[in-house]
UniProtKB/Swiss-Prot annotation:
Its EC number is 3.6.1.1. The keyword Ubl conjugation does not apply. It comes from Dictyostelium discoideum. Keywords: Hydrolase, Magnesium, Metal-binding. This is Inorganic pyrophosphatase. The gene is ppa1. Belongs to the PPase family. Pfam families: Pyrophosphatase (PF00719). GO terms for cellular component: phagocytic vesicle. Gene3D superfamilies: Inorganic pyrophosphatase.
Length: 279
């Protein structure tokens, strides 16, 4: 996959998405539901990477992180961060030249935690498998439907140790801090009390969503049990450290690490990024 997607002939569409304590603008290139579709991010009208420039932590002591919504609840287009492309826009995954859709609609908002990375060079002792080369995934179980490109501030509630095609693929369970019942949910017991059956619903979906495509169920460490908040925080910290090794050049990778805010060897000015993107 090329590190830069050519879209000079496509018309960008500007859309504002407001976030708590920060405002991002998304710029869409190509039509939704097309191979050309890309959703780029700007802050203060300057290009930023959704992977590298948006901070992970909102309040570490309270286990609150930023989550980028890729696939809103109730939808099934397989949207994801384009980790190998310049400035890491969101795109729709492609398989055999066709846009990818999951058979069943997601029963939660699905997305990723910025400034995290599951290194394919690291075998995790809990799973016996190497990382899947992507940011940490997150499943947000609040009542509201997210929007693709929205950054939610979410409270960490647990993690599933999924093993997908032989690779470690952690799934953080979380809830939007602005959800009406977020303040009442601080443990697995609280989830079962206020959202009975939700943990099993998330687990079952993650386990079985590839079966209609002719594949077997995904595997899980810990017998598929949701792990504690403390364990989840350790996983987030580990993948944050692996991300730092990625952008710091300690781990070699084909992923794009270009950014506009980190002030490292991969940082470019906003003007350079905008020119490259034809913004």
């Amino acid at each position: 996959m090329k590190n830069f997607f050519s879209f000079s002939k496509l018309t960008p569409h500007l859309k504002n998405i407001y976030h708590r304590n920060m405002t991002y603008t998304t710029k869409q290139v190509g039509e939704t539901g097309s191979l050309e579709y890309r959703l780029f991010f700007l802050k203060d009208n300057k290009p930023v990477s959704s992977f590298h420039d948006v901070p992970l932590w909102v309040n570490k002591e309270k286990q609150i992180v930023n989550m980028l919504v890729e696939i809103p609840r109730g939808t099934n287009a397989k949207l994801e961060i384009a980790t190998k492309e310049y400035m890491n826009p969101i795109k729709q995954d492609v398989k055999d030249g066709k846009l990818r859709f999951v058979h069943d609609k997601y029963p939660f908002n699905y997305g990723a935690l910025p400034q995290t990375w599951e290194s394919p060079e690291h075998t995790h002792p809990s799973t016996g498998a190497k990382g899947d080369n992507d940011p940490l995934d997150a499943c947000e179980i609040g009542s509201g439907q997210g929007v693709t490109g929205e950054f939610k501030q979410v409270k960490v509630l647990g993690v599933f140790a999924m093993i997908d095609a032989g690779e470690t693929d952690w799934k953080i369970l979380c809830i939007d801090v602005n959800d009406p019942i977020a303040s009442q949910i601080n443990s697995q017991e609280d989830i079962e009390k206020h959202l009975p059956g939700k943990i099993n619903e998330v687990y079952t979906f993650l386990r079985d969503y590839k079966i209609p495509d002719g594949k077997g169920p995904n595997q899980f460490a810990f017998d598929g049990k949701l792990q504690s908040i403390d364990f989840s925080m350790k996983i987030i910290e580990e993948t944050e450290a692996e991300w730092k090794d990625l952008v710091g050049g300690k781990t070699k990778s084909s992923l794009s690490v270009v950014n506009t805010t980190l002030n490292d060897s991969n940082t470019v000015t906003a003007d350079v990024a905008a020119q490259k993107l034809n913004f």
